[in-house]
């Protein structure tokens, strides 16, 4: 019997192969079975982001965080969506929250460096991007 976890794994496999439309379908099926599956929700949001649908992705991450406010991956991806939407101050705040939960999250550190670069703060950008190399 297929369950939400099955479709989440299928979504992850499709996402890893950069088949974002397929991953979106699989995550939607997972969420149809279990609407509170935070892993499928984050995968769905990431797929939407990969398809350039950043506003929609942001809404998915916000919904995920209502289910689990301490899910650092949802926070990190919300920060990335905010960055794509040029909401840089909000992105830094959200990425800081993700880093409180998981201080060694190299992706969150990298995204924070990217945000600072986009804000024109090259000193902080270099710090966070080079921190990723340590």
Regions found by a protein language model. Give the residues of each.
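Register position in tetratricopeptide repeats
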Residues: 16, 50-51, 84, 118
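Helix-start (N-cap) detector for alpha-helical repeat units in TPR-like alpha-solenoids
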Residues: 4-5, 38-39, 72-73, 106-107
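Alpha-helical segment of the N-proximal tetratricopeptide repeat
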Residues: 3-33, 49-50
